[in-house]
């Protein structure tokens, strides 16, 4: 008897026509692993470690219309700190890069490497250290500020 299981994952396209795949038990990619860059003609860029951090950021920006500049950033998602160097060409176009990487050793190391790759004229702002120093990533931060303990709905 053959056992057929349904398989599913949420997929996010990357810059090499591959897909970053996620579900509750799996984190991987189909085809080639790469960064994902979304250019919108803005002067500044937001840098994320993964797509769920980007989605959390989008929700945060939606919840904070009093900070309109949150919606005026181009996007770079590393999809893995191991390939952070691939972001050099894209990030070098910007005068300011807002980094929302994880507050852990790989995130800090990726930030250090990226800082060394960028032109001296590019300002790299460590937003994770400023905005959510007690959380590992943007998703954890968003969950924390929206928890019922803080008087908000989840």
For every predicted segment, state its role.
Residues 8-14:
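Short beta-strand scaffold segments in enzyme catalytic cores
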Residues 49-52, 103:
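Helix N-cap/beta->alpha junction signal
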Residues 56:
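Phosphate-binding glycine-rich loops and their immediate beta-loop-alpha structural context
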Residues 2-4:
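Short, small-residue-biased leader/transition segments that mark boundaries at the very start
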Residues 24-43:
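Glycine-/acidic-rich phosphate or pyrophosphate-binding loops and their flanking alpha/beta elements
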Residues 43, 59-154:
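TOPRIM fold recognition
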Residues 14-23:
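Catalytic donor nucleotide-activated moiety binding site of glycosyltransferases and closely related
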């Amino acid at each position: 008897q053959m056992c057929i299981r349904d398989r599913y994952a949420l997929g996010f396209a990357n810059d090499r026509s591959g897909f970053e795949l996620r579900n509750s038990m799996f984190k991987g990619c189909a085809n080639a692993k790469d960064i994902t860059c979304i250019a919108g003609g803005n002067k500044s860029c937001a840098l994320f470690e993964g797509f769920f951090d980007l989605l959390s950021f989008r929700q945060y920006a939606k919840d904070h219309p009093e900070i309109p500049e949150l919606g005026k950033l181009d996007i770079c998602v590393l999809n893995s700190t191991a390939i952070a160097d691939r972001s050099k060409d894209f990030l070098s176009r910007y005068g300011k890069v807002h980094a929302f990487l994880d507050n852990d050793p790989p995130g800090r190391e990726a930030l250090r490497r990226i800082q060394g790759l960028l032109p001296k004229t590019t300002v790299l702002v460590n937003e994770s250290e400023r905005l959510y120093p007690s959380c590992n990533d943007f998703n954890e931060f968003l969950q924390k500020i929206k928890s019922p303990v803080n008087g908000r709905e989840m």
